[in-house]
Amino acid sequence: DLSIDTITELLHCLDDALLIENGGFEQVKEKMLKEYLGSAYRTPYQAGGVYPSDPSELRGLLSEYCKAIRQEECRVNVNGDLVGILSPHIDYARGQSTYARLWKTARDNLREVELVIVLGTDHYGGPGQITSTFQDYASPLGISPTEISVVQTLANEMGSEFLFKEEFHHIKEHSIELALVWLHYSLEISRLPNIPIVPILCGSFSTF
């Protein structure tokens, strides 16, 4: 049998690790959210882990990924304009060929793009929840400015309480970030300026 002292010690350990949703957890969460909202942009959380934080090293890595893809693998028959890209959000080490083939193919079509609406998987999002943010998204290769007017329109239509209820998730969620690194690289290669974005995290679709 577990003693009261053992249970108490276990609870203290869980509390210290912020694994209990109590006052301490909420205080830390509010502090992190305040720091996030007070920053000039959303800091690239995966830099230095999934991909290099040094711009030159990152460019070299993505360039090597692209060189491994033959040009004939990037030919697709598209009737009309580019309207969307299904980009993976797995780590680059395992998804490199898919990322490279996709973004190398899309590169020539980015010149006409005026706005990128990024729908990223929210691995911790609630059922039916979508979450945007006013923060710009940064990577070592640039900053994607968030189109404030579009996000504000969404907030007006859906309610700010709903749209920003889980904004905290933007801090560490990787799905949008991993796609935007490739967008920044592709724009740089094509000598194009960064394109405004509307970053939206999507929670579980299980309720639909």
Stretches with model-predicted labels:
Residues D1-A47:
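Long, charge-rich, low-complexity alpha-helical segments
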Residues A40-F208:
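Active-site histidine-anchored catalytic micro-motif
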